[in-house]
């Protein structure tokens, strides 16, 4: 069995994960010393799973009768040793259609380490194959939501590390079957509370089933109170009884933030998509939609792709860490994990230019030093994710002297954005149209159609899905869609090998970033450093003053790296930024409808009195990625892909709210301003 806690909604978020406290029996069975309970039956853990959870949720029959391309969602309270998941994987692979996907969600407050999982699985030869697959992708011990995929994405595992009631409200899925695991109600009363059953009801439908090892009266009464029909059955082994059943009601649940509710259902049968913009944001979402079976046309106003910040020789890939593990940290951790999931296969196949050579984040000020050290200790960053280096250790890793301490991220690195754009746009289902500046986006003038009409000076295009990824400089289009995008100029400096006293072994961030690498046969340069922030300057011309500033910042961090050079080279680009430094991602709301539904209403009503957000069908945006685009565009692509096809959410609800395209207008209204 496994543990999950149920704190109140308003309890302060404590990011540091608690470790599982385990004792091992002579037979190799793990026991929680905190709860004085075993993780699974000493008699036969796999037989226990099959009997309680698979049989009493009728999973063999349900998997076998699924239609092609189906989705099936299981939500489990308490991942524990993972035996429930592994046994379910075997059944799924045996019984389900080859193109169906299992989404297995599990919440765990005290996650086991990879080595502890391996030890727990060692006695079960039957699950060795899915165990190895899980251990290969098992996420880092960091709080919150983690997605991993097994068996060519036939199985998606979403792990929530932390309190159950911090996790369950973050989900907006339709659960087909519940695995109510967790240590016994007597020993873990915090989990078995009425709010657990309320959340179960919120995420269930009339076909949803549940099963649990316990038949405690409080559990049965709690489930029945929230609409579940409960039956008892003989328990497994020494347990006298268990219970199982189904959700017997269909009741509406009011949203706590109706203005941020996700667009539901997607397009009924999306076939064609138009993506406006061929930078990183546009190319990645085009690739995602093409991979989902859509025919995609990409419209680019320039003569070539990736002409703004996406055209830099190299960009750093690394997470953002903060001591309070705030929403930006959570978003960019999720984005970092997603970026690596996309990039690793391309690195391995040499399809893109870049290197996962680690990244040293140097603490250039006392404030930065304190922030990074607090993040390391308060969040409890695992060493496989990040570890602290003094100046000597940092110098050794970088390969150049530095006088600064820093935080090293071994999984981070750099990539050439243009190579990613080229790789994405090479998909056979994508057609690229250059020198096509979009002048208007309008619904097709046919009441029976939900298609969009896109006008350029040269052509008219039509599609059922449109994604606007135009970046910083298309002010008219951004204004038309109520996107508060502000362009911020940035200049990077390029250096040839003769301009350097030595190479950098890792990517380095300081007050800017510096990268050494092979940028491709067409590039004469060996290093890049930058980038300046020069708002509100919109001149595309390279500046000597900006080069001097880039050199100064690099030398401040790495005093012996750059040689004296008067050969100034580089690139100017414009970052699309937002007021809160998070991107704008998702379905574009119907702002005219919002005026009546929200802005002309008092902001003080109870939330249930407001209608759920209404969107412009088939219209999406991925913009405002700023200086951290390499950690957000891939996640944005997956978010939009899931919205278009009606697939499950790809990150917590709170993060959807944080990047919602209408968030600034909503915040203004909710503040009482007019």
Swiss-Prot record:
Entry keyword set: Cytoplasm, FAD, Flavoprotein, Methyltransferase, Multifunctional enzyme, Oxidoreductase, S-adenosyl-L-methionine, Transferase, tRNA processing
Region feature (FAD-dependent cmnm(5)s(2)U34 oxidoreductase): 276-674
GO BP, one annotated term: methylation
Similarity comment: In the N-terminal section; belongs to the methyltransferase superfamily. tRNA (mnm(5)s(2)U34)-methyltransferase family. In the C-terminal section; belongs to the DAO family.
Protein's name according to its UniProt entry: tRNA 5-methylaminomethyl-2-thiouridine biosynthesis bifunctional protein MnmC
Catalytic reaction equation(s): 5-aminomethyl-2-thiouridine(34) in tRNA + S-adenosyl-L-methionine = 5-methylaminomethyl-2-thiouridine(34) in tRNA + S-adenosyl-L-homocysteine + H(+)
Protein's UniProt keywords contain tRNA processing: yes
InterPro entries: FAD-dep_OxRdtase (IPR006076), FAD/NAD-bd_sf (IPR036188), MnmC-like_methylTransf (IPR008471), SAM-dependent_MTases_sf (IPR029063), tRNA_MAMT_biosynth_bifunc_MnmC (IPR023032), tRNA_MNMC2 (IPR047785), tRNA_S-uridine_synth_MnmC_C (IPR017610)
Organism phylogeny: Bacteria, Pseudomonadati, Pseudomonadota, Gammaproteobacteria, Thiotrichales
Described purpose of this protein according to its UniProt entry: Catalyzes the last two steps in the biosynthesis of 5-methylaminomethyl-2-thiouridine (mnm(5)s(2)U) at the wobble position (U34) in tRNA. Catalyzes the FAD-dependent demodification of cmnm(5)s(2)U34 to nm(5)s(2)U34, followed by the transfer of a methyl group from S-adenosyl-L-methionine to nm(5)s(2)U34, to form mnm(5)s(2)U34.
Region described as tRNA (mnm(5)s(2)U34)-methyltransferase: spans on this chain: 1-248
Cofactor(s) for this UniProt protein: FAD
GO molecular function, one term: flavin adenine dinucleotide binding
Highest rank taxon of the organism: Bacteria
UniProt EC number: 2.1.1.61, 1.5.-.-
Record flagged with keyword Ribonucleoprotein: no
Gene: mnmC
Places the protein is found: Cytoplasm
Any Gene Ontology CC annotation: cytoplasm
């Amino acid at each position: 069995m496994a543990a999950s806690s149920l704190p109140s909604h308003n309890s302060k978020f404590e990011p540091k994960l608690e470790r599982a406290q385990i004792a091992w029996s002579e037979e190799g069975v793990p026991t929680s010393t905190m709860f004085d309970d075993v993780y699974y039956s000493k008699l036969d853990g796999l037989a226990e799973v099959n009997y309680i959870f698979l049989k009493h949720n009728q999973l063999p029959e349900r998997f076998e009768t699924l239609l092609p391309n189906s989705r099936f969602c299981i939500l489990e309270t308490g991942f524990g040793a993972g035996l429930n998941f592994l046994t379910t994987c075997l059944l799924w692979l045996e019984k389900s259609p080859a193109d169906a996907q299992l989404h297995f969600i599990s919440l765990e407050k005290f996650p086991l380490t990879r080595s502890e999982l391996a030890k727990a699985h060692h006695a079960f030869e039957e699950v060795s194959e899915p165990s190895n697959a899980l251990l290969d992708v098992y996420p880092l011990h960091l709080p919150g939501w983690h997605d991993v995929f097994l068996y060519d994405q036939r199985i998606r595992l979403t792990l929530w590390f932390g309190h159950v009631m911090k996790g369950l409200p973050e989900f907006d899925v339709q659960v087909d079957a519940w695995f109510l695991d967790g240590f016994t109600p007597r020993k873990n009363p915090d989990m078995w509370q009425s709010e657990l059953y309320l959340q179960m009801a919120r995420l269930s439908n009339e076909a949803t089933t549940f099963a649990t090892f316990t038949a405690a009266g409080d559990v049965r009464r709690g489930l029945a109170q929230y609409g579940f029909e409960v039956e008892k059955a003989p328990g497994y082994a020494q347990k006298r009884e268990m219970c199982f059943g189904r959700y017997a009601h269909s009741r509406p649940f009011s949203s706590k933030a109706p203005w941020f509710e996700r667009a539901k259902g997607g397009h009924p049968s999306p076939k064609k998509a138009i993506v406006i913009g061929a930078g990183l944001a546009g190319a990645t979402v085009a690739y995602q939609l093409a991979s989902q079976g859509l025919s995609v046309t990409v419209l680019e106003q320039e003569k070539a792709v990736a002409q703004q910040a996406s055209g830099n020789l190299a960009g750093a890939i690394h997470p953002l860490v903060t001591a309070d593990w705030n929403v930006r940290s959570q978003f960019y951790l999720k984005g970092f994990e997603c970026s690596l999931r996309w990039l690793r296969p391309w690195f391995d196949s040499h399809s893109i230019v870049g290197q996962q050579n680690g990244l040293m984040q140097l603490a250039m000020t006392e404030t930065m030093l304190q922030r990074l050290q607090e993040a390391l200790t308060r969040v409890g960053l695992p060493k496989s994710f990040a570890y602290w280096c003094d100046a000597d250790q940092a110098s050794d890793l970088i390969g150049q002297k530095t006088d600064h301490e820093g935080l090293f991220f071994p999984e981070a690195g750099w990539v050439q954005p243009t190579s990613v754009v080229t790789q994405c746009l090479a998909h056979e289902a994508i057609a690229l149209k250059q020198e096509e500046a979009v002048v208007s986006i309008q619904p097709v003038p046919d009441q029976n159609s939900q298609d969009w009409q896109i006008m350029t000076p040269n052509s008219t295009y039509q599609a059922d899905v449109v994604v606007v990824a135009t970046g910083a400089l298309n002010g008219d289009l951004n204004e038309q869609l109520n996107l508060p995008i502000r362009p911020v100029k940035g200049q990077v400096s390029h250096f040839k090998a003769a301009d350097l006293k030595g190479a950098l072994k890792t990517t380095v961030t300081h007050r800017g970033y510096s990268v050494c690498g092979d940028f491709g046969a067409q590039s004469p340069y060996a290093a890049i450093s930058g980038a300046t922030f020069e708002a509100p300057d919109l001149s595309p011309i390279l500046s000597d003053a900006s080069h001097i500033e880039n050199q100064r910042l690099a030398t401040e961090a790495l005093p012996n790296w750059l040689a004296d050079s008067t050969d100034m080279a580089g690139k100017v680009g414009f970052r699309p930024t937002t007021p809160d430094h998070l991107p704008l991602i998702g379905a574009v709301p119907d702002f005219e409808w919002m005026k009546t539904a929200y802005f002309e209403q008092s902001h003080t009503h109870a939330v249930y009195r407001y209608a759920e957000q209404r969107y412009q069908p088939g219209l999406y945006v991925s913009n405002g990625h700023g200086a951290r685009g390499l950690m957000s565009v891939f996640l944005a692509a997956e978010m939009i892909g899931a919205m278009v096809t009606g697939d499950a959410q790809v990150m917590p609800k709170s993060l959807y709210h944080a990047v919602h395209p209408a968030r600034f207008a909503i915040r203004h209204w909710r503040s009482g301003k007019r």
